[in-house]
């Protein structure tokens, strides 16, 4: 039985940073065949329209198995770098799944990926790390950076990115334009101004 493979985006820093990191997370979800969920705090749930008709991208916080989701900080026990350092995830640099030690180990239920200004989980941007990350069901993405340009450097994503964005410099424009539309309460404030 194949479980869902999801990315849960966690808000961090100011609104502009949140928007840019959100579209980067969405792009990563597209490239890896994951469901993209947004863990918005209750006071920000109406900020943007739902981008997908008939469904929601909001994470149902009350049913989520990870406690204290907004209070994990930038380097919790399940952070990707800590899992690498403790050998709970092992990367051998080869694309052969049989040679990767994660095949013989139980895969963590979730990995916390911190791509904030401190760049705690830098190995994420190395292509050989995408194979073990692909085996994890839940990626909790804690980011305040627009990291979409860095995805272009990962060999496994380059062909798909070229197909999706023939003009590479249009990536942010197209993603922002598609994904982030102000919600009705925001439009109400804008029109009353």
What kind of feature is each model-predicted range?
Residues 1-193:
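Secretory-pathway glycan-assembly enzymes, especially type II membrane glycosyltransferases
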């Amino acid at each position: 039985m194949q479980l869902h493979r999801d990315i849960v985006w966690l808000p961090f820093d100011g609104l502009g940073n949140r928007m840019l990191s959100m579209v980067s997370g969405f792009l990563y979800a597209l490239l890896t065949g994951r469901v993209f969920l947004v863990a918005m705090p209750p006071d920000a749930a109406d900020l943007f329209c739902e981008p997908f008709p008939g469904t929601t991208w909001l994470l149902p916080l009350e049913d989520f198995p990870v406690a204290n989701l907004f209070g994990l900080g930038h380097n919790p026990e399940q952070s990707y770098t800590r899992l690498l350092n403790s050998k709970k995830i092992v990367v051998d640099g080869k694309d052969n799944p049989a040679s990767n030690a994660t095949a013989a180990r139980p895969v963590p239920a979730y990995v916390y990926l911190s791509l904030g200004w401190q760049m705690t989980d830098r190995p994420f941007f190395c292509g050989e790390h995408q194979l073990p990350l692909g085996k994890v069901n839940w990626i909790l993405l804690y980011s305040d950076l627009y990291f979409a340009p860095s995805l272009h450097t990962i060999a496994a994503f380059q062909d798909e990115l070229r197909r999706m964005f023939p003009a590479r410099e249009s990536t942010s424009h197209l993603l922002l334009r598609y994904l982030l539309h102000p919600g009705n309460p925001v439009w109400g404030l804008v029109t009353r101004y």
